[in-house]
Amino acid sequence: MPRIVLITGASSGYGKATAKAFKENGDTVIMTARNLEKLNSACSEVGGDLAFSMDVTNPSDWDLAVKSVKEKYGRLDVLVNNAGGGVAIKEVSEFTTEEIDATIKLNLNSVIYGCRAFADMMKEQKCGTMINISSVCARQCWPTWSVYAAAKAGVLNFSKGMYLEMQPHNVRVSCVVPSSASTGFQSACGIGSTADQLLPEDIAETVLYIANLPQRAVVEDVTVWGIDKQVNPL
């Protein structure tokens, strides 16, 4: 039976590539993002089954997502918390309070909200997989990336704690930690590209691999580097 998969930030980058990978795997794919026009275009391109606009930083939107999934499908098998972004990449002293709050909300709070929203459903099912997308900034940091790195480190450690809470219910929680890849986020941050760097499809394959493991097996976290990287992924 096809799995029901929900992916946030699915209009581009990792999210869009992940939606395509699950769809090609024969799963039923729900795609969400803020920009409905871009989302609908991406959904048509990859053959997604359902698309709806949502703000992952708004808990009420998560409540509506749970309601929609429950009414249409009755369950959720895989949740991919992919939505995120830099908001601002600069020295901490240059951040406004609003930019700090926005960075933490988009990259950390959104993941917590998503896992909280679908936790009860997956507990009742006694199965399910939550996959949260972090960043290598969770493991090491560089000047101007401090606030973003703090949020992504939070995602990594939140995922570890969430797994311990969900494990007794046969629900898996994993964290994927990607290096820089060829996405819109990279371009917006002014990061150069190389022929050997990661592609969104590489992260999508990693996410799909984790989800395809037998329910008895769980990947706690996995870091994916491009072969062109050594110590500094940027």
Tell me the role of every PLM-derived stretch:
Residues 11-12:
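Conserved glycine-rich cofactor-binding loop
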Residues 135:
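Residue(s) in the substrate-gating loop at a strand-loop-helix junction
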Residues 90-92, 99-104:
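Substrate-binding pocket helix/loop in short-chain dehydrogenase/reductase
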Residues 168-171, 175-176, 183, 192-232:
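C-terminal helical subdomain
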Residues 54-64, 97:
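The beta1-alpha1 cofactor-binding region of Rossmann-like NAD(H)/NADP(H)-dependent oxidoreductases
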Residues 115, 151:
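Active-site helix of classical SDR
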Residues 25-41:
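Conserved glycine-rich Rossmann-like NAD(P)H-binding loop of the short-chain dehydrogenase/reductase
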